[in-house]
Amino acid sequence: MRPERTWFPLTGAVTPGAAAGPKPTGPIDPLAGPKQVLAGRVVTMDDALSVRPDGVVYIDRGCVVAVQDRGQPAPAGFEQVKVVLTGGTIYPGLIELHNHLSYNVLPLWSPVPKRFEHRGQWADHKEYRPKISGPMTVIGEHRDAAGEADLVPALVRYVECKCLLGGVTTSQGIMLASNAGIRRYYRGLIRNVEQTDDPALSEAQSRIADVDAEDAQRFLTQLRKEDSCYLLHLSEGVTDPKQPEKSQAREHFCSLEIAPGQWALTNAFCGIHAAGLLPEDFAVLAGRHASMVWSPLSNLLLYGGTARVEAARKEGVRIGLGSDWSPTGSKNLLGELKVAWLYSQHVLNGLFSARDLVAMVTREAASILKWDGLVGRIAAGARADLLVIHGTAGDPYEALIRAREVDIRLVMINGAARYGTSALMGPLAPKDQTVRVGGESRALYLKQQQADPDVAAVSLRTAKTTLREALLDIAKLAKEAEKPKPAPARRALDAPVRPVWSLALDEIPDQGED
């Protein structure tokens, strides 16, 4: 369990009094929404994996009250609520357990210059700084004439909307760091697995750096304290089974063995990538009820191979799915589903069914987070995180995998309709913004009671324009950043500190304490 946090907005001064003040509590949107009724084919992803061909989902105060067939009487209190006919198939919102969201303004690193053996190599390649870390550092630390981090709000708005347009309702967070030594996750539209601000949804930890052998015991102690999961980048690279001792990627997994047969692994452990593990390593994970997140496209582009998910499946290791980041991964989780499907069909002889893969981004991901029953399924008592795609014909699981962004009719989080066609958004949300997807108009509702004011002031259209111009002028912005800045004026010791926020990127050293 984490200590109590203080909420700091992107704007305004931080004073000692404010630092001690209350933070927002409760979910990303208050559980106070109106009664709503959605009709369509309902893919519940419940324990029975039931599908209702002509179903109705009843929602009140952000939660699902009931899921029934159209012919059944409405639950008490819903008799006069108008039924919204979706004309589509209703799924739980997609849950992504691996994504570096801040980087999702960048294009694909194409072609990847060579096949790498482990993650320690590609970050040192000569192309990495000019194409990835350099632009992101400039965007994350850029200051306008007033000294404000003017590109950060645009980036946050853009990458969150990119999630919504792909049906994602839960992902990893965007870490911010301030000049006052404060670190926090951005509180936004989609659920953040590391900072839910919801007592019913326990918060995950995440770590990119490897755990060294001398730290394994301390890591195990930390794992035993977790009430959600610990998302650790694990064994990111490839291993030749004929020469496993030469694999640096697998070496980091072996570092988790504290003593013969004693591992720094529990049911809270979730290994992201796990690409360098051998079949026998998945038996170790399974024996300790650990789980993994599969990111096939990024693995294939960087390493020419991916996790031995067939071994994970054989051993009963629970698997989630993540698109990683846009430089080497899919543009969203909907795209990563397609990569996983193609890999399963053409490399693994159809090992994973379409239903298996849909489970990885719904109920299985929720189980990894210890959020069973609350998200990842459509059932009474679950949060109304929903995704609707066009049409009700054919296999419902293949329909989701084959769906394109233009097929998405509605995305709802905590009962708040956030994105969809005008026909569905009209009766469910106030007018806000529009965006064109595949040549068709879609509606967005991005307003929140507790939004960061800087981000709230940025429309998606403005965010796109701002980021496009910044990336086109990235060399110029980089040179400006290198110019010496005037020393800040002195202030009284008790004067408020004006925080200036930057993106806390993977390559940038820590700038404060959690």
Q: What is the role of each PLM region?
A:
Residues 333-341, 361-362:
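Structural motif of enzymes handling amino- and sulfur-group chemistry
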